[in-house]
Amino acid sequence: MKTASIHFWSTLVLLFSCIGSVIAYSSTDLTTMYDWNQIIKPLEWGQMNFIHTTDTHGWLNGHLRDARYKADFGEFKSFVLRMKELADFKDVDLLLVDTGDLHDGNGLSDASDPEGIYTNNIFTYLPYDILTIGNHELYQASVSNNTHEYFVPHWNGTYLASNVQIFNSSNELEQFAAESAYFTTKHGVRVLAVGFLYDFTGNANNTVVTPVETAVNSRWYQQQINRTDVDLFLLLGHIPVRDWDEWKSLHASIRKVHPDTPIQIFGGHSHIRDFAVYDESSVSLEGGRYCETVGWLSIDGLAASNATRQYVGRPVTNETRQSYPNLPIPNTPLYYTRRYIDFNRQNFRFHTQQSEDSFDTPEGIELSKIIKQYRDDLNLSYVFGCVPKNYYMTEVSPQSDDSIFKLMTDRVLPEIITNRNRSTVPRIIISNGGGIRGSMYQGKFGPDEMFQLNPFLTNYYMYLADVPYKYAKKLYSTLNGGSNLRNINENLAALNPGYVTSDDFGEDGDDTVHTSVPSYATPNILQAQAGFNATSSPETIDVVFLNFLQSIVLKALNNMANDTLYTSSNVTQYWVRDDGYDSSPYSFAYFVQQEWSDNCD
C-alpha cells in the first residue's frame, strides 16, 4: 500500500483548533432506534449465488449513528467468510462482486491525499472475485493514477475496466485494468466477465472512456463474445440496471451470438436497490449504496453447473423486458431469487446462522481494528461542533425548517460564502442540490459528517462581478426545474423506517420489512441572497456560483441578453481563504464551528 499523506487534514484540524478549542463529546452518541425483533427473511441459495456491493463511497466503517447500517467492513468480511463456509457446506458456488465508486462520501476515503488510499487498502482484505470501475475513480487524476498503479495490480486481472484507458508515465495510452476475465467456478461453470463504465464524460484528462456502443464493436470484445467455451456471461458495470442503453447494447451483442447462454448483470451508479429482467436467462441486480445494502442473487437450473439443483426461485414470466426487442428468446429459462440485505451485524448473523459469540472471524476482527486505526490516523474523531437537531436531505420538503437545503440557503451560503473585498456588494449565491449527498444529524459534526454531507473537494465558489440585476434575478427560475414529492407511505407506522423496494419481481426483495420513508426530490438549483432584501432592486449584483455550474450560468445569462456578455475570462474565484480550505464542503465545517462549537456537552 502506498503511504497516504494526511498533511492537509492534520493542517485543517490544527487550523480549527486555533479557531476554537477541540471539542470532546459524549461516548453515548445518538443512534437511530432499531427494533431487532423485526422479521428478517431468509436467503434462498441456488446452484450459483452472488454477494454484490456497489457505490460504497468510503462508508467502510459503517454508519456509526444509524443501527440499521452500522456494520463495518470487518464485520462484512466475517459475513462473507461465513457465507463462503455455508456455500461449501451446501456444495454450491458463491461469488463476491463489486461495481465501483469506492470513495467520495466519507472521511475514511476522502481525508487522505490522494483520496481513497485507505479505503482501497481495506477493500483488498476482502476476497472479491470480480470488481469493476466507477466514475468516482476518474474525476481526479491523482486518484485514477493511484488506483491504476497500486489498487488494480492487487487483483491479478479480476479488476475490470473494459472501456477505460489511462495515460501512463510515458504519456502512452494503456488499459486502465483488464478488459475481461475468464474463470471456472468450483462447480464447473465457465464464466466470461467484463466490466464497463457508463458513457462518462466528466473524467480527468489523464483517462479516456470509450462509449459502450463503440466498445461493443471493437475487435477484442467481438473476439471474447464469440468464444464457444462460455457457460455464463457475467456483466459488471457502473451503470443503472433499468432504462440505460449501455446495458441494452451489451445484452443484445451477446444474445445475438449466444441465444441460450445465461447473461448475469450487476449494475450501480444510481444508488438504489433494483432488480430488472432482460430475458428468460438474463436478469440484473443493483445493490444500493453507502454500505446500506448487500445485494444477494441466486440462480438455479444451470445445466453447466455440477452443483445439486436446489429447486428455489422463480422463472421470468411476463415482466417487462429491459432488452431491445426482436432478440432471440433463450430456450433454457432459469430460476432466480434476490434479496437486499440491511448492512448490519444482526442481519449478517441471521443469514450466516451464527450466534453473537460465533459470528466473528479472526480476519474480520483484525480488519475492524485496522479500520479503527485508519480513523485515528486521519484524525476523524475531531469535532467542529454539535448540531442541535436533524436537518434532512429528502425526508422533508426543501422549504421546511428541518431541511438541509433551507439551512444552506438561509444561513450557510449567505454567512460563510463571502469575499472580504466585495462584502458590501449585493450578491446571489447559486449552488446545486445534487452537491448535497446526505442529511445533517443531531450530535457531533466532524470530518466524516462533512464529507458525508458534501464530498466534492473540487467544487469552488466563483463569481461574475456587477451583473445587471434584470438578468440575475431570472437565473433561479431559468436553471431550476423544481422538486416533487414521491414515495409517501404512512400506513406502516409500527415498522422501522427504511427501504421499501419495488422491482421486477415485486415487493418482497428487502430482507427486513420497513415502513417507507417520505422522500422529496432534491432541488436542481439552490439560491441564496445577501446584501439586499427581496423587495429591493439593485442595478447590479455579484453572481456567485459553483464552478460546476459555470457553463450553464454563462449560457443562461448570455441567452437572456441575446449577446455574449460573459465568457470564462470574466469568472474569478469568490470565496478565497488564506489557508486554502475554501472548496464547498468546508462551508459546512466553518458554519458548524461558528454556530455550534459550544453546543457539545
Curated annotation (Swiss-Prot):
Molecular function terms, GO-annotated: 5'-nucleotidase activity
Coiled coil: none
Keywords noted in UniProt: Cytoplasm, Nucleus, Signal
Biological process according to GO: adenosine metabolic process; nucleobase-containing compound catabolic process; nucleotide catabolic process
PANTHER family membership: 5'-NUCLEOTIDASE-RELATED, PHOSPHOPROTEIN PHOSPHATASE
Species assigned in the record: Schizosaccharomyces pombe (strain 972 / ATCC 24843)
Domain of life: Eukaryota
Signal peptide location: 1-24
GO CC, alphabetical: cytosol; extracellular region; nucleus
Protein name (database record): Uncharacterized protein PB2B2.06c
Keyword Zinc-finger: no
Cell location: Cytoplasm; Nucleus
Pfam families: Metallophos, NadN_nucleosid_C
Claim: Mitochondrion is one of the keywords in the record: no
